[in-house]
Protein backbone atom coordinates (compact mmCIF):
# COMPACT_ATOMS: atom_id res chain seq x y z
CA UNK A 1 0.00 0.00 0.00
CA UNK A 2 1.35 3.44 -0.95
CA UNK A 3 2.42 5.45 2.11
CA UNK A 4 1.00 8.67 0.63
CA UNK A 5 -2.41 7.01 0.30
CA UNK A 6 -2.34 6.08 3.98
CA UNK A 7 -1.14 9.50 5.21
CA UNK A 8 -3.73 11.26 3.03
CA UNK A 9 -6.46 9.15 4.61
CA UNK A 10 -5.13 9.83 8.11
CA UNK A 11 -5.06 13.60 7.57
CA UNK A 12 -8.55 13.55 6.02
CA UNK A 13 -9.85 11.68 9.08
CA UNK A 14 -8.41 14.27 11.47
CA UNK A 15 -9.67 17.22 9.42
CA UNK A 16 -13.13 15.64 9.37
CA UNK A 17 -12.94 15.41 13.17
CA UNK A 18 -12.09 19.12 13.38
CA UNK A 19 -15.01 20.03 11.12
CA UNK A 20 -17.31 17.85 13.26
CA UNK A 21 -16.31 19.93 16.29
CA UNK A 22 -17.29 23.06 14.37
CA UNK A 23 -20.75 21.59 13.71
CA UNK A 24 -21.12 20.44 17.33
CA UNK A 25 -20.55 24.04 18.41
CA UNK A 26 -23.25 25.17 15.92
CA UNK A 27 -20.78 27.18 13.84
CA UNK A 28 -21.38 25.44 10.49
CA UNK A 29 -23.97 26.38 7.86
CA UNK A 30 -26.10 24.00 5.77
CA UNK A 31 -23.55 23.45 2.94
CA UNK A 32 -20.84 22.82 5.56
CA UNK A 33 -23.02 20.18 7.26
CA UNK A 34 -23.90 18.62 3.91
CA UNK A 35 -20.23 18.22 2.97
CA UNK A 36 -19.47 16.81 6.43
CA UNK A 37 -22.09 14.05 6.02
CA UNK A 38 -20.94 13.24 2.49
CA UNK A 39 -17.28 13.08 3.53
CA UNK A 40 -18.15 10.83 6.48
CA UNK A 41 -19.61 8.26 4.10
CA UNK A 42 -16.58 8.62 1.83
CA UNK A 43 -14.13 8.10 4.71
CA UNK A 44 -15.95 4.95 5.80
CA UNK A 45 -15.67 3.58 2.28
CA UNK A 46 -11.99 4.47 2.02
CA UNK A 47 -11.27 3.00 5.46
CA UNK A 48 -12.92 -0.26 4.47
CA UNK A 49 -10.98 -0.38 1.20
CA UNK A 50 -7.65 0.36 2.88
CA UNK A 51 -8.35 -1.85 5.89
CA UNK A 52 -7.63 1.03 8.30
CA UNK A 53 -9.39 1.96 11.52
CA UNK A 54 -10.80 5.50 11.36
CA UNK A 55 -10.20 6.33 15.03
CA UNK A 56 -6.56 5.23 14.90
CA UNK A 57 -6.09 7.06 11.59
CA UNK A 58 -7.53 10.24 13.15
CA UNK A 59 -4.90 10.22 15.93
CA UNK A 60 -2.06 9.76 13.45
CA UNK A 61 -3.54 12.45 11.21
CA UNK A 62 -3.54 14.85 14.17
CA UNK A 63 0.19 14.25 14.69
CA UNK A 64 0.90 14.90 10.99
CA UNK A 65 -1.08 18.17 10.99
CA UNK A 66 0.47 19.37 14.27
CA UNK A 67 3.96 18.74 12.88
CA UNK A 68 3.17 20.72 9.72
CA UNK A 69 1.66 23.64 11.67
CA UNK A 70 4.65 23.74 13.99
CA UNK A 71 7.00 24.15 11.03
CA UNK A 72 4.73 26.50 9.07
CA UNK A 73 5.43 30.23 9.28
CA UNK A 74 2.60 32.77 9.29
CA UNK A 75 3.97 34.37 6.12
CA UNK A 76 4.04 31.05 4.25
CA UNK A 77 0.47 30.38 5.38
CA UNK A 78 -0.67 33.76 4.05
CA UNK A 79 1.01 33.13 0.68
CA UNK A 80 -0.51 29.65 0.45
CA UNK A 81 -4.01 30.94 1.16
CA UNK A 82 -3.63 33.77 -1.35
CA UNK A 83 -2.53 31.44 -4.15
CA UNK A 84 -5.23 28.81 -3.60
CA UNK A 85 -8.51 29.44 -5.43
CA UNK A 86 -11.61 29.09 -3.29
CA UNK A 87 -14.45 26.84 -4.39
CA UNK A 88 -18.10 27.84 -4.09
CA UNK A 89 -21.07 25.70 -3.12
CA UNK A 90 -24.02 25.85 -5.53
CA UNK A 91 -27.47 24.74 -4.38
CA UNK A 92 -30.25 23.90 -6.83
CA UNK A 93 -31.99 21.82 -4.18
CA UNK A 94 -33.24 22.73 -0.73
CA UNK A 95 -32.10 20.75 2.31
CA UNK A 96 -35.48 18.98 2.26
CA UNK A 97 -35.09 17.97 -1.39
CA UNK A 98 -31.50 16.90 -0.76
CA UNK A 99 -32.26 14.68 2.24
CA UNK A 100 -35.69 13.30 1.30
CA UNK A 101 -36.03 9.52 1.00
CA UNK A 102 -37.58 8.20 -2.22
CA UNK A 103 -38.72 4.86 -3.60
CA UNK A 104 -38.80 3.28 -7.06
CA UNK A 105 -41.57 1.06 -8.45
CA UNK A 106 -39.30 -0.30 -11.20
CA UNK A 107 -35.74 0.40 -10.03
CA UNK A 108 -32.79 0.53 -12.38
CA UNK A 109 -29.22 1.19 -11.29
CA UNK A 110 -26.12 1.73 -13.41
CA UNK A 111 -22.55 2.57 -12.49
CA UNK A 112 -20.91 5.06 -14.85
CA UNK A 113 -17.27 5.52 -13.86
CA UNK A 114 -17.13 6.84 -10.28
CA UNK A 115 -20.84 7.75 -10.27
CA UNK A 116 -23.97 5.73 -9.50
CA UNK A 117 -27.12 6.39 -11.55
CA UNK A 118 -30.54 5.34 -10.26
CA UNK A 119 -33.91 5.82 -11.94
CA UNK A 120 -37.50 4.64 -11.75
CA UNK A 121 -38.44 2.99 -15.05
CA UNK A 122 -42.14 3.12 -14.13
CA UNK A 123 -42.25 6.88 -14.77
CA UNK A 124 -43.82 7.71 -18.15
CA UNK A 125 -44.81 10.87 -20.05
CA UNK A 126 -43.77 13.30 -17.33
CA UNK A 127 -42.01 16.65 -17.42
CA UNK A 128 -38.82 16.18 -15.42
CA UNK A 129 -36.26 18.69 -14.13
CA UNK A 130 -32.69 17.77 -13.15
CA UNK A 131 -31.36 19.73 -10.17
CA UNK A 132 -28.05 19.35 -8.36
CA UNK A 133 -25.94 20.57 -5.48
CA UNK A 134 -22.24 20.84 -6.28
CA UNK A 135 -19.08 22.83 -5.73
CA UNK A 136 -17.62 25.18 -8.35
CA UNK A 137 -14.09 26.42 -8.97
CA UNK A 138 -13.03 28.75 -11.81
CA UNK A 139 -16.74 28.90 -12.78
CA UNK A 140 -16.76 25.18 -13.62
CA UNK A 141 -18.34 22.27 -11.79
CA UNK A 142 -15.73 20.78 -9.45
CA UNK A 143 -17.46 18.13 -7.31
CA UNK A 144 -20.99 16.76 -7.59
CA UNK A 145 -22.65 16.36 -4.21
CA UNK A 146 -25.96 14.97 -5.46
CA UNK A 147 -28.16 15.28 -8.55
CA UNK A 148 -31.85 14.40 -8.54
CA UNK A 149 -34.62 14.26 -11.13
CA UNK A 150 -37.95 15.81 -10.10
CA UNK A 151 -41.38 15.65 -11.73
CA UNK A 152 -43.57 18.76 -11.84
CA UNK A 153 -45.39 17.35 -8.80
CA UNK A 154 -42.11 17.26 -6.87
CA UNK A 155 -41.62 13.48 -6.87
CA UNK A 156 -38.04 12.21 -7.12
CA UNK A 157 -37.65 9.76 -10.03
CA UNK A 158 -33.89 9.63 -10.59
CA UNK A 159 -30.56 10.33 -8.95
CA UNK A 160 -26.81 10.57 -9.61
CA UNK A 161 -24.45 10.28 -6.65
CA UNK A 162 -20.69 9.72 -6.18
CA UNK A 163 -19.62 6.17 -5.30
CA UNK A 164 -18.32 6.06 -1.72
CA UNK A 165 -15.71 3.44 -2.60
CA UNK A 166 -14.46 5.40 -5.63
CA UNK A 167 -13.71 8.96 -4.45
CA UNK A 168 -13.05 11.64 -7.03
CA UNK A 169 -14.68 12.40 -10.37
CA UNK A 170 -14.28 14.84 -13.25
CA UNK A 171 -16.72 17.19 -14.92
CA UNK A 172 -16.78 14.82 -17.91
CA UNK A 173 -17.80 11.96 -15.60
CA UNK A 174 -20.74 14.06 -14.42
CA UNK A 175 -21.81 15.07 -17.94
CA UNK A 176 -21.63 11.48 -19.17
CA UNK A 177 -23.74 10.30 -16.22
CA UNK A 178 -26.30 13.03 -16.90
CA UNK A 179 -26.49 11.87 -20.54
CA UNK A 180 -27.18 8.30 -19.38
CA UNK A 181 -29.88 9.45 -16.95
CA UNK A 182 -31.55 11.62 -19.59
CA UNK A 183 -31.50 8.78 -22.10
CA UNK A 184 -33.04 6.39 -19.58
CA UNK A 185 -35.83 8.79 -18.63
CA UNK A 186 -36.59 9.83 -22.22
CA UNK A 187 -36.95 6.15 -23.17
CA UNK A 188 -40.41 6.24 -21.56
CA UNK A 189 -41.44 9.44 -23.37
CA UNK A 190 -40.57 11.73 -20.48
CA UNK A 191 -39.43 15.27 -21.27
CA UNK A 192 -36.23 16.03 -19.37
CA UNK A 193 -34.81 19.48 -18.69
CA UNK A 194 -31.65 20.52 -16.87
CA UNK A 195 -31.62 23.49 -14.49
CA UNK A 196 -29.97 26.61 -15.88
CA UNK A 197 -27.52 26.64 -12.97
CA UNK A 198 -26.31 23.13 -13.76
CA UNK A 199 -26.12 23.92 -17.49
CA UNK A 200 -24.03 27.01 -16.83
CA UNK A 201 -21.39 25.37 -14.64
CA UNK A 202 -21.27 21.95 -16.34
CA UNK A 203 -21.50 23.01 -19.99
CA UNK A 204 -20.69 26.71 -19.79
CA UNK A 205 -23.91 27.61 -21.61
CA UNK A 206 -27.65 27.69 -21.13
CA UNK A 207 -30.04 26.03 -23.58
CA UNK A 208 -33.48 27.62 -23.96
CA UNK A 209 -35.28 24.26 -23.95
CA UNK A 210 -33.43 23.13 -20.84
CA UNK A 211 -31.45 20.43 -22.58
CA UNK A 212 -27.67 20.21 -22.14
CA UNK A 213 -25.38 20.16 -25.20
CA UNK A 214 -24.72 16.47 -25.84
CA UNK A 215 -21.44 15.03 -27.05
CA UNK A 216 -21.38 13.30 -30.48
CA UNK A 217 -21.11 9.95 -28.67
CA UNK A 218 -24.22 10.71 -26.61
CA UNK A 219 -26.12 11.86 -29.72
CA UNK A 220 -25.26 8.63 -31.57
CA UNK A 221 -26.32 6.56 -28.57
CA UNK A 222 -29.65 8.38 -28.29
CA UNK A 223 -30.23 8.06 -32.05
CA UNK A 224 -29.67 4.28 -31.88
CA UNK A 225 -32.07 4.11 -28.94
CA UNK A 226 -34.73 6.04 -30.86
CA UNK A 227 -34.39 3.81 -33.97
CA UNK A 228 -34.65 0.68 -31.83
CA UNK A 229 -37.80 2.01 -30.16
CA UNK A 230 -39.42 2.82 -33.52
CA UNK A 231 -38.70 -0.72 -34.78
CA UNK A 232 -40.30 -2.24 -31.70
CA UNK A 233 -43.36 -0.01 -32.05
CA UNK A 234 -43.79 -1.11 -35.68
CA UNK A 235 -43.51 -4.77 -34.71
CA UNK A 236 -46.14 -4.24 -32.01
CA UNK A 237 -48.52 -2.74 -34.60
Swiss-Prot record:
Residues 180-215 are annotated as: CPSF4-binding. The keyword Plastid does not apply. Residues 1-73 are annotated as: RNA-binding and homodimerization. It is found in: Host nucleus; Host cytoplasm. One of its GO terms (biological process) is symbiont-mediated suppression of host type I interferon-mediated signaling pathway. Keywords: Eukaryotic host gene expression shutoff by virus, Host cytoplasm, Host gene expression shutoff by virus, Host mRNA suppression by virus, Host nucleus, Host-virus interaction, Inhibition of host innate immune response by virus, Inhibition of host interferon signaling pathway by virus, Inhibition of host PKR by virus, Inhibition of host pre-mRNA processing by virus, Inhibition of host RIG-I by virus, Inhibition of host RLR pathway by virus, Interferon antiviral system evasion, RNA-binding, Ubl conjugation, Viral immunoevasion. It comes from the Viruses. A motif (Nuclear export signal) lies at residues 137-146. Residues 217-237 have a biased composition (Basic residues). InterPro entries: NS1, NS1A, NS1A_effect_dom-like_sf, uS15_NS1_RNA-bd_sf. A motif (Nuclear localization signal) lies at residues 34-38. Residues 205-237 are annotated as: Disordered. One of its GO terms (molecular function) is protein serine/threonine kinase inhibitor activity. The keyword ATP-binding does not apply. One of its GO terms (cellular component) is host cell cytoplasm. Residues 223-230 are annotated as: PABPN1-binding. Upon interferon induction, ISGylated via host HERC5; this results in the impairment of NS1 interaction with RNA targets due to its inability to form homodimers and to interact with host EIF2AK2/PKR. HAMAP family: INFV_NS1. Inhibits post-transcriptional processing of cellular pre-mRNA, by binding and inhibiting two cellular proteins that are required for the 3'-end processing of cellular pre-mRNAs: the 30 kDa cleavage and polyadenylation specificity factor/CPSF4 and the poly(A)-binding protein 2/PABPN1. In turn, unprocessed 3' end pre-mRNAs accumulate in the host nucleus and are no longer exported to the cytoplasm. Cellular protein synthesis is thereby shut off very early after virus infection. Homodimer. Interacts with host TRIM25 (via coiled coil); this interaction specifically inhibits TRIM25 multimerization and TRIM25-mediated RIGI CARD ubiquitination. Interacts with human EIF2AK2/PKR, CPSF4, IVNS1ABP and PABPN1. The dsRNA-binding region is required for suppression of RNA silencing. Belongs to the influenza A viruses NS1 family. This is Non-structural protein 1.
